[in-house]
Amino acid sequence: MMITLRKLPLAVAVAAGVMSAQAMAVDFHGYARSGIGWTGSGGEQQCFQTTGAQSKYRLGNECETYAELKLGQEVWKEGDKSFYFDTNVAYSVAQQNDWEATDPAFREANVQGKNLIEWLPGSTIWAGKRFYQRHDVHMIDFYYWDISGPGAGLENIDVGFGKLSLAATRSSEAGGSSSFASNNIYDYTNETANDVFDVRLAQMEINPGGTLELGVDYGRANLRDNYRLVDGASKDGWLFTAEHTQSVLKGFNKFVVQYATDSMTSQGKGLSQGSGVAFDNEKFAYNINNNGHMLRILDHGAISMGDNWDMMYVGMYQDINWDNDNGTKWWTVGIRPMYKWTPIMSTVMEIGYDNVESQRTGDKNNQYKITLAQQWQAGDSIWSRPAIRVFATYAKWDEKWGYDYTGSSSTNPYYGKAVSADFNGGSFGRGDSDEWTFGAQMEIWW
């Protein structure tokens, strides 16, 4: 069809608008999960996690609606040089009602500049809040190396035999105290900045299909002028990480060894807590501290076993040994096999076991959890999402110890400490029981 002169300006404007929209297209990524569930003994879905464990087996065992919404855009590009702006807002509600208001968490807001340094081709300069090179076990939602937060860095520097990355990030915690000479008042609820300095050397090919990553993190409490720390605060600490990744059976296996000291032992993933530990809304911190060390040995992966079977797996031993005897020994093992009936329908089972020993009491808490789910997903991989699943979960536990949060830290000398289940005639931990739940859930990442 011939375009008249009158219509030509409109056609040009529309075409220009389309090209402009494509050039300025915004990247939309994210993650979300939500569903509905019931408990066999009555009421809404309960979720099961062993006291003292830092995570739980998640299939058929998530009781909240959670979402991360990421918007990003390459805002400038010239040759191989570019600037990218990235954001991430997260939400979490209890999925109990239609209208559930919550304050969003601003997780990411950063700019990444690629190839800006002529003599470091392939490297990236970045600054802002960021999820920084996180390492996790998906099936237990456990992040074992994660220094995310506000920060800055230079990453992916090619050193010939690997990629070097340097970063500094920050997290804050209650525990720092402001002192006033006139009345000697201490307010332990003030936040104290903790800085983490991270060095990583990754992508070192050491065997066919295998790579090695090494990392060192140093964390320290960074006090303002006229501030002091609670007595016995650890102040600083180190985390050393070695991770070997092997390509195997159309998937991967990761073997990880980590060792941490003092302020880096509480979370054990690279974030520092060096100012002491405050509980809830206490007016001053309980003088517990995290001086000591942590050892973690972890193996996890995901593999394909023929055309119809995929499987995730994890095995981990973690020993947090604190000078105050409030540490734990935690070991966990689990598998998640998946049988694919069609390219979009599968049956998934998850079996997981946790055992946590209290350093103080010597008692042990244990739990095993089994989930069977029928699932429809967008593809034939165990990683394919979105997925809609119906599930049934059975959990049985036997807990011999718990943490004493009776009263307050000012009145209870055992506040925050591990105690036996029947300590002082009380009831700590979850006892010896079992339960089953059932429901439906969607999960998506894009």
Swiss-Prot record:
Compartments, record wording: Cell outer membrane
Chief place of localization: membrane
Residues annotated as transmembrane: 27-35, 65-78, 81-93, 105-115, 123-130, 149-159, 162-173, 192-205, 210-222, 235-248, 251-263, 291-305, 308-323, 327-341, 344-359, 363-378, 386-400, 431-445
Extracellular side: 36-64, 94-104, 131-148, 174-191, 223-234, 264-290, 324-326, 360-362, 401-430
GO biological process: monoatomic ion transport
Coiled coil: none
Signal sequence residues: 1-25
Site (Greasy slide, important in sugar transport): 31, 66, 99, 252, 383, 445
A single MF term (Gene Ontology): maltose transporting porin activity
Induction of expression: By maltose.
Record-linked NCBIfam families: PRK09360.1 (NF006860)
Subunit structure: Homotrimer formed of three 18-stranded antiparallel beta-barrels, containing three independent channels.
Family: Belongs to the porin LamB (TC 1.B.3) family.
HAMAP family linked to this entry: LamB
PANTHER family, per the entry: CRYPTIC OUTER MEMBRANE PORIN BGLH-RELATED (PTHR38762:SF1)
Protein name from the UniProt record: Maltoporin
Native organism: Escherichia coli O6:H1 (strain CFT073 / ATCC 700928 / UPEC)
